[in-house]
Amino acid sequence: MKSQLLSLAVAVTTISQGVVGQEPFGWPFKPMVTQDDLQNKIKLKDIMAGVEKLQSFSDAHPEKNRVFGGNGHKDTVEWIYNEIKATGYYDVKKQEQVHLWSHAEAALNANGKDLKASAMSYSPPASKIMAELVVAKNNGCNATDYPANTQGKIVLVERGVCSFGEKSAQAGDAKAAGAIVYNNVPGSLAGTLGGLDKRHVPTAGLSQEDGKNLATLVASGKIDVTMNVISLFENRTTWNVIAETKGGDHNNVIMLGAHSDSVDAGPGINDNGSGSIGIMTVAKALTNFKLNNAVRFAWWTAEEFGLLGSTFYVNSLDDRELHKVKLYLNFDMIGSPNFANQIYDGDGSAYNMTGPAGSAEIEYLFEKFFDDQGIPHQPTAFTGRSDYSAFIKRNVPAGGLFTGAEVVKTPEQVKLFGGEAGVAYDKNYHRKGDTVANINKGAIFLNTRAIAYAIAEYARSLKGFPTRPKTGKRDVNPQYSKMPGGGCGHHTVFM
């Protein structure tokens, strides 16, 4: 009798002390998660219902978008929080923060001809600057790239190598009156300077075609440019949603995330409703199983304005807490209409940008997912242009998937993935046409299954995965860009 009472006391103590991270009801009777079982729980109808819900949040408000701090994004955050909380399987929180929102518009005229330009967010305003145009060398990332006579002139800079913010700052140091950054790939260019900086000058983006034409004209003679930039600024309260499984080892956390906000131009259903709903679908499917390692899901805010939400989160963790995160997986645009199956190049073999130790193994795992089904895939540059940036800067292994943004699909890629050559992976990238109709159902379904495949693997075991690198600082030069001018893997057009 005494031993029975002791057992009861232990059980009661365990229950009463298990509030934080307490295993959900029925946990012992759930089957252990496997890759096949978790993938089989992924249903296209659930994914499409999710993206349609996000579309409804955009449609319900005059802005017709889901920009952080706006009504469409507030609805998105509340819905994600409530949906995940209702499962009872996760400890869920909203992480409040305040960030500076910016909206900018530009008008550009060269020698009497109007050009289609996009102001960089966080650009200083400009009221009818009229000045001669000069051209910077070598992407304008160093002081020596700017002509000696730059002072008081508007400088034309090609995109690439460094961030838009750095280009604007260098132009400011050279005492330019303004800067125009033109694309280094076909198509228009919009982006962000990443925040306010006293060194910045009024800055606008221009298409590759128009930029090259201007450079040619400057080489032939004097070009006069008129530039107007209207910029609005506002501090906005917003939230990340963080959900961690109640069960599993909380010292061995598998983390994944997707940003939940859109740009001003439209509802952002591929960018990045696709990633948000992809990980939500996996989160709900995971509730049918038990696991060995805890899994932490994150829906980031304000990615489109400089990876603000994910950076805020990572900076909120000390080295000890962040060391519990054994790897981070990022999913930003996984339903592109003219898609290509792309995996972050964690081993650096394709783009010579290597992630922290373990990033290569993440890449190989996703390669195996596609290879086992005979599905083509290719690497995409590990540039730091999406929400994994803050993690790799602190030496957390990372990886993920991306189906393409504004870059044009090649004939060689059509042979691999189908689709249309000479057309962007997502022709509605950062535009009002990024609606539910913009989603490639096959791509989003396949990539959501790939997420499930990876989560099942790592939630079950980290056997064979490299020992987590010591948490610390790592030099990363994000090639930010995801606005027309980057790519969401690639996201936030910073560069």
From Swiss-Prot:
Cofactor: Zn(2+)
Cellular location(s): Secreted
Function: Extracellular aminopeptidase that releases a wide variety of amino acids from natural peptides and contributes to pathogenicity.
Binding, Zn(2+) 1: H259, D271, D332
Pfam family, one: PA
Assigned protein family: Belongs to the peptidase M28 family. M28A subfamily.
Residues that bind Zn(2+) 2: D271, E304, H430
Induction, as annotated: Expression is strongly increased during growth on protein-rich medium. Expression levels are the same whether keratin is present or not in the protein-rich medium.
Single GO molecular function: metalloexopeptidase activity
SUPFAM superfamilies on file: PA domain (SSF52025), Zn-dependent exopeptidases (SSF53187)
Originating gene: LAP2
GO cellular component labels: extracellular region
Subunit structure: Monomer.
Active site: E303
Keyword Protease found: yes
TM spans (from-to): none
EC number, as in UniProt: 3.4.11.-
Name by which UniProt lists this protein: Leucine aminopeptidase 2
Organism of this sequence: Trichophyton rubrum
Site, as annotated: Transition state stabilizer: Y429
Record text on activity regulation: Activity is inhibited by EDTA, o-phenanthroline, bestatin and amastatin.
